[in-house]
Design a protein with these regions (language model features):
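N-terminal secretory signal peptides and thylakoid transit peptides that target proteins
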Residues: 4-20
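An N-terminally biased module of ancient metal coordination in phosphate/nucleic-acid-related enzymes
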Residues: 12-15, 28-140, 146-157
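Hydrophobic faces of well-ordered beta-strands that scaffold small-molecule active sites
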Residues: 66-68, 137-139, 179-181, 205-207, ...
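Well-ordered, non-membrane alpha-helical segments in soluble/globular domains
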Residues: 95-96, 107-126, 156-168, 221, ...
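Acidic (Asp/Glu)-rich catalytic clusters
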Residues: 125-133, 162-175, 194-201, 224-230, ...
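Active-site-proximal loop/turn and secondary-structure-junction residues that shape catalytic pockets
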Residues: 143-144, 183-185, 209-211, 239-243, ...
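Acidic, His- and aromatic-enriched active-site or binding-groove loops in soluble protein domains
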Residues: 162, 202-211
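Catalytic pocket-lining loop regions of alpha/beta-barrel enzymes
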Residues: 203-204, 217-296
């Protein structure tokens, strides 16, 4: 119908919000200290909500609870090695600039020089304190975009969070965090990097194929799949349409059927965002088949 939220209409709306956000962000930030997030650790007391939360935790051992999809971001101002694409800090790229503002706000991070990385970690600790004792978060490292020759490209990477930083944050705060490595399978040293991650206590590997330039069905991934299966670590991989992280912007790599190659190599695969948007070619009907919804 006329009110259907098509991809084109959604992009137009997001672009408008981004432009509007640039105008309003300074005003809201000055008046409230953040953009929109009130930065509370706990929900306001509400009987219905309290009962729902109590029911959700019933029978769950919080010591075995791990929120396994938590991005670790920042600006690199702590010497963490984090990199952010310059477009996310440029007014000439309003959508990505606005995204950066929203992400920082969501993490209750403020533009205090030298404190952004640390403030983000402190906010996550604050949120864990609002959970049941023993619950932890799985922090994601995030590798750069790489081309088909395995060469990293900072210009095509939205952001980069080193494995070493994710490992260090988790090691300093084991009561709050565990960590997941991010290793591009086209890298010459991908198998060695995986061995180092396993030795450092990584519990999983994180990919975002459309942003990182990873075709999960490519034979280039085979040696990494073999090493990952041998290590017994799961692969947490995005599938579906990707809007939050541009990077390489190769949406076809979000086709969930491409991950069958990992399964065929014995890798345990967690498909992230399986209630998300997006359409892809139904490869079971051939590569020239029409596109269908990624998830039904």
């Amino acid at each position: 119908g006329d009110t259907e939220m098509t991809p084109a209409r959604r992009r137009l709306l997001l672009g408008g919000l981004a432009l509007g956000g640039l105008t309003l962000s300074g005003v809201v930030a000055q008046r409230s200290g953040s953009l929109f997030n009130s930065c509370q650790a706990l929900l306001p007391p509400t009987p219905a909500v309290d009962e729902l939360i109590r029911w959700a935790w019933e029978g769950v051992d919080a010591r075995r609870f791990l929120d396994c999809h938590v991005h670790l971001v920042g600006t690199g101002d702590s010497g963490s090695g984090i990199e952010v694409n310059p477009q996310m800090e440029s007014l000439f790229h309003p959508l990505q600039y606005a995204q950066r503002l929203f992400y920082l706000n969501a993490g209750c991070v403020h533009d205090a020089p030298g404190r952004i990385d640390d403030s983000y970690v402190e906010r996550m600790q604050n949120l864990v304190d609002g959970l049941r004792p023993g619950a932890r978060l799985l922090l994601f490292a995030f590798d750069r975009f790489h081309d088909v020759e395995g060469r990293a490209s900072r210009q095509r990477s939205s952001f980069y969070t080193p494995n070493a930083y994710a490992q260090a944050v988790a090691a300093r705060n084991p009561q709050y965090f565990a960590w997941a490595a991010s290793i591009h399978p086209y890298r010459d040293d991908c198998v060695e990097a995986l061995a180092a991650a396993v030795a450092g206590g990584a519990l999983a590997v994180k990919w975002l194929p459309p942003a990182m330039g990873i075709d999960p069905s490519s034979p280039r991934c085979d040696r990494f799949y073999a090493a990952l299966a041998a290590a017994g670590l799961p692969l947490i991989s995005h599938a579906g349409e990707e809007k939050a992280v541009h990077g390489g912007d190769q949406q076809a790599f979000g086709n969930p059927l491409l991950l069958r190659r990992a399964l065929d190599h014995g890798v345990r695969v967690v498909v992230a965002h399986c209630a998300s948007l997006g359409s892809a070619v139904d490869l079971d009907q051939g590569e020239s088949a029409p596109q269908v919804a990624c998830f039904d």
